[in-house]
């Protein structure tokens, strides 16, 4: 666990790779998404509960990703996730995919809170915002 973030292990499976055993570029997004979801779970929130009880969903608003070094079949990796900014309806995540101390990829992901009934951005629930502010 990072000081103000979360670490999540991922193993590279055959389904994640191309014919050469290298992780397909879109799979990195899956790894980052899983880590953000599990991070939320450690704060005692689930996307399913927010969806069912409040009709809220977290959606990716913007994403920037850098691929530095290829991940390969059977690698055991760590996704490090930190919150760098919390605003009314958005949270900015900084994420790194690591193999030991080597950074393979990094991503900056802005996630927005959306009211699914209106399909418009809304402020994060107070308890979610407070949980993330506590980490900063």
Curated annotation (Swiss-Prot):
Record: active site: 18
Enzyme class: hydrolase
InterPro entries (alphabetical): 4-hydroxybenzoyl-CoA_TE (IPR050563), HB-CoA_thioesterase_AS (IPR008272), HotDog_dom_sf (IPR029069), Tol-Pal_acyl-CoA_thioesterase (IPR014166), YbgC/YbaW (IPR006684)
Record carries keyword NADP: no
GO MF terms, alphabetically ordered: fatty acyl-CoA hydrolase activity
Record EC number: 3.1.2.-
Pfam families, A to Z: 4HBT_2 (PF13279)
UniProt keywords, alphabetically: Hydrolase
Entry function: Displays acyl-CoA thioesterase activity with short chain aliphatic acyl-CoA thioesters, such as propionyl-CoA and butyryl-CoA. Enzyme activity is relatively low, suggesting that the acyl-CoA thioesters used in the assays are not the physiological substrates. Has no detectable activity with 4-hydroxybenzoyl-CoA, lauroyl-CoA (C12:0), arachidoyl-CoA (C20:0) and arachidonoyl-CoA (C20:4).
NCBIfam families: thio_ybgC (TIGR02799), YbgC/FadM family acyl-CoA thioesterase (TIGR00051)
Family: Belongs to the 4-hydroxybenzoyl-CoA thioesterase family.
Protein name: Acyl-CoA thioesterase YbgC
Organism: Haemophilus influenzae (strain ATCC 51907 / DSM 11121 / KW20 / Rd)
Gene label: ybgC
């Amino acid at each position: 666990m990072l000081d103000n973030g979360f670490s999540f292990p991922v193993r590279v499976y055959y389904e994640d790779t191309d014919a050469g055993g290298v992780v397909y570029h879109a799979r990195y997004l899956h790894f980052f998404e899983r880590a953000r979801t599990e991070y939320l779970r450690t704060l005692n929130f689930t996307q399913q509960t927010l969806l069912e009880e409040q009709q809220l969903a977290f959606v990716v608003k913007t994403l920037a990703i850098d691929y530095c070094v290829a991940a390969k079949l059977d690698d055991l990796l760590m996704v490090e996730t930190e919150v760098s900014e919390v605003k009314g309806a958005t949270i900015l995540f900084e994420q790194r995919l690591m193999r030991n101390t080597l950074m393979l990829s990094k991503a900056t992901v802005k996630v927005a809170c959306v009211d699914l009934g209106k399909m418009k951005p809304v402020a994060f629930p107070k308890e979610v915002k407070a949980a993330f502010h506590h980490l900063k």
